[in-house]
Amino acid sequence: MDDVTKALNLVPMVVEQTSRGERAYDIYSRLLKERLIFLVGPIDDYMANLIVAQLLFLEAENPEKDINIYINSPGGVVTAGMAIYDTMQYIKPAVSTICVGQAASMGALLLASGASGKRYALPNSRVMIHQPLGGFQGQATDVDIHAREILALRARLNEILAKHTGQSLETIAHDTERDNFKSAVDAQAYGLVDQVFGQRQEELIQSS
């Protein structure tokens, strides 16, 4: 691992004064105490397990208080994203989603699936929706099986987007035929987020 890679992988530490003296946290653990979760980078099984564990932990800690997920992701594995989605819908606390940077593919679906009225995007963030990608190779019968699975996944993802955006299934199917990029304002108009803001809102501070 070169010096640049090591530097990029460094996680800042913060020091907090407690009744027992100083305690050091990595920045993400400290923010988790404030019920802030970061979904950053490609969505794979490892990331999904981390996000699901954090959601379940915060629910156990306080089932009545909102959880905030900050999303900056190009998307990733559909089944991993669905594990996060199902957990967001399953737990009792309302889950607010905030797009910083980009929310593409499964990242966009998770952004849209936040609690109604609590889905946000920063003004220069980008959102992209599209159909699931396939690239299976092998025997013709196996290719056919995987093709039918992709079509089933596509139908289910379209249903979820339609549910959370208020768009019709026909509109979602048409708009996800190809990569469909949207600005934060366009994402709000489409129903992917509820609000675009450049400064932290007072109600978001209080819900945290």
UniProtKB/Swiss-Prot annotation:
User: According to its UniProt record, where is this protein mainly located?
Assistant: cytoplasm
Domain of life, per UniProt, equals: Bacteria
Q: What is its EC number?
A: 3.4.21.92
Q: Which Gene3D superfamilies match?
A: 2-enoyl-CoA Hydratase, Chain A, domain 1
InterPro entries to which the protein is assigned, alphabetical = ClpP, ClpP/crotonase-like_dom_sf, ClpP/TepA, ClpP_His_AS, ClpP_Ser_AS
Q: What class of enzyme is it?
A: hydrolase
The answer to whether UniProt assigns keyword Oxidoreductase to this entry is no
Return the protein name: ATP-dependent Clp protease proteolytic subunit
Gene name in the database record: clpP
